[in-house]
Amino acid sequence: MTRPVTLTEPHFSQHTLNKYASLMAQGNGYLGLRASHEEDYTRQTRGMYLAGFYHRAGKGEINELVNLPDVVGMEIAINGEVFSLSHEAWQRELDFASGELRRNVVWRTSNGSGYTIASRRFVSADQLPLIALEITITPLDADTSVLISTGIDATQTNHGRQHLDETQVRVFGQHLMQGIYTTQDGRSDVAISCCCMVSGDVQQCYTAKERRLQQHTSAQLHAGETVTLQKLVWIDWRDDRQAVLDEWGSASLRQLEMCAQQSYDQLLAASTENWRQWWQKRRITVNGGDAHDQQALDYALYHLRIMTPAHDERSSIAAKGLTGEG
């Protein structure tokens, strides 16, 4: 079997942010993640959804997939200047074979200093509640200070409709954080656990303010040195409440800690092997002169898999799959 093709975003434009966030979305049928950028943009709609996790925000509102707290967002400041792609060249692609989304940027600050910023992430096909992210920053021609802030952002809404109450947020040791949130009708809980590990000599602290639980990492780098942040996320939800809240949250945290014993590449390899077996059984190949025909078929099958909750016969395919609210 030939390797499934990739989908590439040809250029960066704030007018197509949400188009490509849907086209290049990731998932595994249990969990869907829009392909939003790590940094913020005014027109960007972030989104993370669980199959079957619906809620009605209030009287007269519709029953809809809940937009979960965001775990992708990162604020990157280099020598005090906040990173943004507004005027920069770049490359971003979604690999259908592994489900990995990759982005590489060479960015220059206002003083002309250059930096390579590379990020990649995947939603695991091997362990359904797992998301893995990695970002590397390398100064090309000057010493620099780098600040990376990331965590769990529960200010996310369904276009202004808030479905979740913050039940419990906690930090464990130097690397672990967890937020537990409850739907406003009190029927369902979701636990979002994160592990952030950074290479090299860095300083770290945590803040919890205005529904944001964040880890802040600062590093001093010489030209050519690289700082790497690996972030693992484990997402559980329940609607039966058979276990005590703390016990249930601790069980999720233990699952995340087991994953954290492996590297990003090891976790990706297990997920890629799952995708390989899936494609081997289901891929349709086209013998023809137009490569777009094969890309269209691969794209359709990829999205069919990431939106179909094959793990749970009680869940159906939502109106927008797991790429958006509805």
For every predicted segment, state its role.
Residues 1-27, 31-326:
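Acidic/polar, glycine-enriched structural segments that form the non-catalytic walls/loops
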